[in-house]
Structure formats: structure tokens, C-alpha cells
């Protein structure tokens, strides 16, 4: 965008989409979408999430600012506030990636989405970026929730509890297996 366009307010800046992460994909696996510390879902400070209303899954404390697709699939739902995305995998698992607790109240500030509903995505493709500092400054928790919302129809097992730990919580890297869906 040129100098005059900036002054005149013409056009919106084009978002800079991060490079895709490389995931070694396996069938029936949901992968870590952002480098994280794993937290038991029942320890999340939100009744809806901690009681499993969004389905079986994991709560993760983000150590990055880009959320990558945790599985191959089709984007079924995006939020106008850009804080959550729903993906249906080829085998029918409905995966919700939800950034932050009550961050819907931020009205999209601090979030940038790179995909739209109806798009096919691959594991490792950038879905959205977020500003964790801005989330905290706004008084919210930046915990990322990854859940299988139709877990009442299929088995979901947490597989990412081994490895390096910080304060007793597993340290996970983008692309490592997080959940198995059967």
C-alpha cells in the first residue's frame, strides 16, 4: 500500500500468513497446533470447558502466537471474533481449536484468521495468529483448547503426556501427536 493510500485509508493491509509447519501425519491423530505446556482439561478455569461440554480434549498454555491446523480436514466453522475454528476431519472427528477463555469478549482484537469456512486445510497449515500479551492485558486467560466436540460418538485418548516437563506439565512442540481419535 502506498503513502497516499495509507493517508486516504484506501484498502486494508494484506495479512502476512506464516509458513506452514511440517507435521508427520498419521491416521486418527490430532496434533499440537501451537508449542505449549499441556494442562489437564479439568484444571481449566472455565466450567464449560473443565466439565467437557466442548468434548474430550486438552488445554494447552501457548508458547507461540500462531495456531496451526491440528489435523487435515475441512474448516466447518470460523468465528467473526477470530478466536475459534472448527475442523471436520476426513473420518468425521469435529475438532474445535479455541484460543483463550472468554476471549470472544475481545471482539477480534488481538486475533488474525488466515482461513475461511469451507476451505480444506492440512495439518500444519496456519489457521490464526493471536497476541497472548494482549489477551492477558485485557484480563483474559490465553489457554488454547483443542477438543473433539463429537467425542460422545468416538473414543478420544490423550497421547501427549510423556517427554520433557516444566512444573510437572508436559512440554509439547507444534506437530507432535496430542489426541488419538478412534
List each model region and its residues.
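Contiguous, well-folded functional domains in the mature portion of proteins
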Residues: 2-182
Amino acid at each position: 500500500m502506498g503513502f497516499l493510500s495509507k493517508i486516504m485509508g484506501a484498502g486494508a493491509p494484506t495479512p502476512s500468513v506464516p509458513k506452514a509447519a511440517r507435521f508427520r501425519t498419521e491416521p486418527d491423530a490430532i496434533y499440537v497446533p501451537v508449542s505449549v505446556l499441556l494442562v489437564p482439561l479439568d484444571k481449566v478455569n472455565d466450567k464449560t470447558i473443565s466439565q467437557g461440554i466442548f468434548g474430550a480434549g486438552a488445554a494447552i498454555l501457548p508458547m507461540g502466537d500462531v495456531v496451526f491446523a491440528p489435523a487435515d480436514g475441512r474448516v466447518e466453522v470460523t468465528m467473526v471474533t477470530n478466536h475459534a475454528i472448527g475442523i471436520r476431519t476426513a473420518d468425521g472427528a469435529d475438532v474445535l481449536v479455541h484460543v483463550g477463555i472468554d476471549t470472544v469478549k475481545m471482539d477480534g482484537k488481538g486475533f488474525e484468521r488466515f482461513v475461511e469456512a469451507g476451505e480444506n486445510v492440512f495439518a500444519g497449515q496456519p489457521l490464526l495468529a493471536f497476541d497472548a500479551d494482549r489477551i492477558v492485558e485485557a484480563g483474559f486467560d490465553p489457554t488454547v483448547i483443542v477438543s473433539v466436540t463429537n467425542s460422545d460418538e468416538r473414543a478420544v485418548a490423550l497421547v501427549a503426556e510423556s517427554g520433557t516437563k516444566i512444573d510437572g506439565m508436559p512440554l509439547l512442540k507444534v506437530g507432535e501427536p496430542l489426541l488419538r481419535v478412534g
